[in-house]
Amino acid sequence: MMGETPNSSKVPRLEASMARSQYRGSEVSLDTIPYSGIWPRIKKISRETPVQISFWLYGTFLSGAITSGRKDSNGLNKSRTRLEDIFKVKREPVSVFLLATIFNYVFFFCFHQLNLVVNGVRLN
């Protein structure tokens, strides 16, 4: 027993495209199948369903000191933290307050170490 006979035959896409190009008037190739033999099968060829390729690109292309961020890799999918996530701390008012406080400490420390007089008052 050989099994069931298929209801339809599928023609490879390469042969179908060669027959179409030959029909348009291009050069006859030795590899092509004659027009009369392939055309009835081309009309009833089953279409291949296109695969939907979707991906998210959360890339940050930065150089210099701002190239930090976590890298997540899962198989072939690699993503990097978004720009909003990297700079999230800098947008919060608490971090601005801390930065100003540190600047004040450094400023007064420098004046104290150098024993500078500001407006007639010694800062020590």
Swiss-Prot record:
Key words of the record: Membrane, Transmembrane, Transmembrane helix
Q: Mind naming one GO cellular-component term on file for this protein? A: membrane
Q: What is its main location?
A: membrane
Q: Which top-rank group of organisms is this from? A: Eukaryota
How does it sit in the bilayer?
Answer: Single-pass membrane protein
Localization terms from the record: Membrane
Transmembrane residue ranges = 94-114
Keyword Transmembrane part of the UniProt annotation: yes
What extra comment accompanies this record? Partially overlaps SEC61.
Under which name does UniProt file this protein? Putative uncharacterized protein YLR379W
